[in-house]
Amino acid sequence: RLVNASGPTGGEVRLKDGGKHNSVGIIHCVGSRDINTNRYCSRLCCMASLKLAHLIKERTGAEVYNFYIDIRAAGKGYEEFYDKLLKEEVHFIRGRVAEVSDWTITADEEGKLLIRVEDTLIGVVRIIPVVMVVLAVGLEPSADADNIRRMFNISYSYEGWFLERHPKLAPVSTFTDGISLAGACQGPQDIPDSVAQAGAAAAEALALIDEGFVELVPNTAFVQDEFCS
């Protein structure tokens, strides 16, 4: 919200005390691709972080450091945007951040946060002093997703995302007739994919409406006493 023109600071990136900064660290994959939290990739965090890095660099001229595991810029124009940031001299350090502390050693580090990370591309442990740290937090299912799943009898994955009927042949349908999926309830989704899914789900709903009626499978549960203990 700090880079938003309608945000609390009018689009100016400022510290808590109102001061300006000259260095920012963006830590990718916080809560994603980790066996201790969420094993899956949250998919859209890389591009959101790159966009933020570009805006900070453009508006403040600060040194921006991206700490990443892998840059997953898979999408139309995404790789080109990544190359643009490299030309803007945004720093990219490949490696998991070990810790962020305020234990400074030199006078230049006073009042800053120290990011300790192993740069796997050069095999060196580095300590980067920054004034502000931004966490690219992974996506998780909504807190009330389980209630909705039970209400509409929707299958779900190990992580809690709603499951489609078939990943290729029926990507927005569910095993419950009349219920379709769209957006981040199925998994981490960016805006273009969510809009495309919403269109497909709306088309399925219109197909049901055009029929004028819905066929129900007349399944009836009953008890066979001879098989009961």
Role assignments for model-derived ranges:
Residues R1-S229:
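Residues forming the flavin
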